[in-house]
């Protein structure tokens, strides 16, 4: 199955609370992608948003059928915070997965975000995380 990434480039519409516009735009992508067997991941760029925006975006993404919500591209300030990850999990329907990007560089951090309900992680330190996991398994 293919994955269609929708990077939220509708920042002005979100900040002005024009969620009808945002929903229509994301819905169009979801319908086109799902019609071709692809999944849809909506990237928020949380460092630019207030909690109320993140909450509403999670609701909208669930309503229009997005498969994932993602904290950021990983290039913005701050990375995936516990606060944002818990908020996104709490505000998204159970069928919408949460992906953390930025700030997951150790096996312990991976376990911590997993405990918050994250099902996917974007990490540049994947090799180091896996090496740490293997070392622990060897005991």
Provide a role label for each language-model segment.
Residues 1-98, 106-128, 136-139:
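Alpha/beta enzyme core
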Residues 101:
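Short hydrophobic "strand-cap" motifs at the C-terminus of beta-strands
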Residues 132:
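C-terminal active-site subregion of NodB/CE4 polysaccharide deacetylases
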């Amino acid at each position: 199955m293919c994955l269609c990434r929708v990077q939220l480039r509708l920042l002005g519409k979100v900040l002005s609370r024009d969620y009808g516009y945002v929903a229509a735009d994301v819905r169009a992508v979801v319908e086109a992608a799902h019609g071709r067997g692809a999944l849809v991941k909506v990237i928020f760029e949380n460092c630019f948003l207030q909690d109320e925006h993140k909450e509403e975006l999670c609701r909208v993404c669930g309503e229009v059928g997005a498969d994932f919500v993602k904290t950021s591209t990983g290039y913005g300030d701050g990375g995936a915070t516990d606060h944002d990850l818990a908020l996104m999990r709490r505000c998204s329907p159970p069928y919408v997965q949460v992906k953390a990007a930025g700030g997951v560089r150790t096996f312990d951090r991976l376990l911590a975000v997993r405990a918050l309900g994250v099902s996917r992680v974007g990490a540049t330190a994947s090799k180091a995380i896996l090496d740490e996991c293997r070392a622990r398994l060897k005991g």
